[in-house]
């Protein structure tokens, strides 16, 4: 077995499959004098670094529990002219994360709230910010179950660990006193620490009704 074959075997053993796939091209470039050894090694190492980054990004997107993978480029702003496109594009820069700002999408069903919230969430996940998507009903169901099992603090800490938490469809179904209490416990724990993105069909002026049940 010659050293070339041993090299290929070593690369596979180390899991450096991107380098293995490109090694012949770079050997030819070096032999022809079109690439220095240092440049070749640098570019080959970048192939692995980029692949590792892509895998990490895909893992972040996968665990985020998105209902679908739609990005802002898939959104039809012409269909919803009332939506400020520039404002959405500004949110896609993710400046709101460093400022620990929250995002609230308000509107009736079918206007694209979930699509836009998901698009922002995907961008966050791609930049390897811990992100999680959950419907309000599922969130409250989990918190109520945890409360009944005397482990509410553990579950609240679970949802507080995410840098970006997306809570979808608040107000889609009636909210009882227990649900309101649990929701505001979570929000108060996340406030000014991490970012929360909320979609709701309830006008912001009516959110004071939540305070009444408390």
Each model region followed by its residue ranges:
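Conserved hydrophobic/aromatic pocket- or pore-lining residues that grip, position, or stack substrates
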Residues: 75, 117, 135
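Interdomain "pre-motor" coupling segment immediately N-terminal to P-loop NTPase/helicase cores
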Residues: 8, 12, 16-68
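Walker A/P-loop
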Residues: 105-129
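Residue-level preference for the first positions of well-ordered beta-strands
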Residues: 102-104, 164
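N-terminal pre-Walker A segment at the start of P-loop NTPase domains
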Residues: 70-92
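Phosphate-binding P-loop
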Residues: 92-100
